[in-house]
């Protein structure tokens, strides 16, 4: 992780979805996998050879074109994402992994799949059916869904290694980054906090929109 004195660097990374570190990872031959919801296990999208990008639409203020396709009644998040996609802001994506959770993000991702929006001939969209109950049947269903709609497509489309060894490596990196962020967050608990809430959230957000091995 970079030192906190580089906060301006982190802030700049949040100005565009296709930021400096995303471009660097793409230049190294890695695949960019977009997602929008915490129901999508971030760590699975960070397997060796690819990296996850939680989609945002920085500085989008008026999603006029997206409203034509979606509706003014749809929340601004989904419309802003689609507006940015129509502007070409997500052309770096190699895939978009959706979840059957929030309706508006489902509609946005369906538009990505049905319309020729992302200028990448190999781009694809897939949806995972997420259970909302915690029982043994739900666990089995969720595991089957992640295998069929996340791991298998990554392996079949882009040759990503989905072995147990690769999964453990991705989990190790994810846990390392999470531990560092938790340690930074602990500074907020001091009697005289040495980091502001704003600074912490900039760092946290960067960890979700940049390749973790580069931050």
Question: What spans do the regions from the language model cover?
Answer:
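TRNA-binding/sensing appendages of the translation machinery
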Residues: 27-53
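Glycine-rich, highly charged phosphate/nucleotide-binding loops
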Residues: 69-87
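Short, solvent-exposed loop/turn segments at secondary-structure junctions
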Residues: 39-41, 58-60, 103, 132-133
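Domain-level signal for soluble alpha/beta catalytic cores
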Residues: 30-31, 66, 92-93
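Anionic-ligand anchoring segments at beta-strand to alpha-helix junctions in alpha/beta enzyme folds, i.e.
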Residues: 44-72
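Internal, well-ordered alpha/beta segment that forms a basic, Gly-enriched binding/recognition surface
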Residues: 90-91, 95-187
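Conserved beta-strand termini and adjacent loop/short-helix elements that scaffold enzyme active sites
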Residues: 36, 55-57, 128-130
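A charged, amphipathic alpha-helical module
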Residues: 1-31, 143, 152-215
């Amino acid at each position: 992780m970079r030192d906190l004195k580089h906060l301006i660097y982190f802030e700049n990374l949040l100005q565009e979805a296709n930021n400096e570190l995303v471009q660097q990872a793409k230049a190294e031959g890695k695949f960019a996998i977009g997602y929008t919801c915490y129901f999508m296990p971030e760590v699975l999208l960070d397997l060796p050879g690819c990296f996850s990008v939680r989609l945002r639409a920085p500085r989008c203020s008026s999603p006029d074109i997206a409203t034509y396709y979606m509706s003014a009644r749809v929340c601004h998040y989904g419309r802003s994402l689609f507006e940015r996609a129509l502007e070409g802001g997500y052309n770096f994506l190699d895939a978009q992994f959706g979840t059957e959770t929030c309706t508006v993000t489902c509609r946005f991702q369906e538009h990505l799949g049905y319309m020729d929006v992302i200028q990448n001939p190999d781009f694809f969209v897939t949806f995972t059916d997420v259970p909302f109950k915690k029982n043994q049947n739900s666990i089995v269903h969720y595991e089957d869904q992640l295998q069929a709609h996340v791991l298998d497509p990554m392996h079949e489309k882009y040759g990503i290694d989905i072995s147990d060894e690769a999964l453990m490596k991705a989990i190790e990196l994810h846990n390392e980054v999470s531990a560092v962020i938790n340690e930074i967050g602990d500074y907020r608990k001091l009697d005289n906090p040495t980091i502001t809430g704003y600074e912490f959230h900039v760092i946290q957000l960067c960890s979700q929109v940049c390749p973790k091995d580069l931050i």
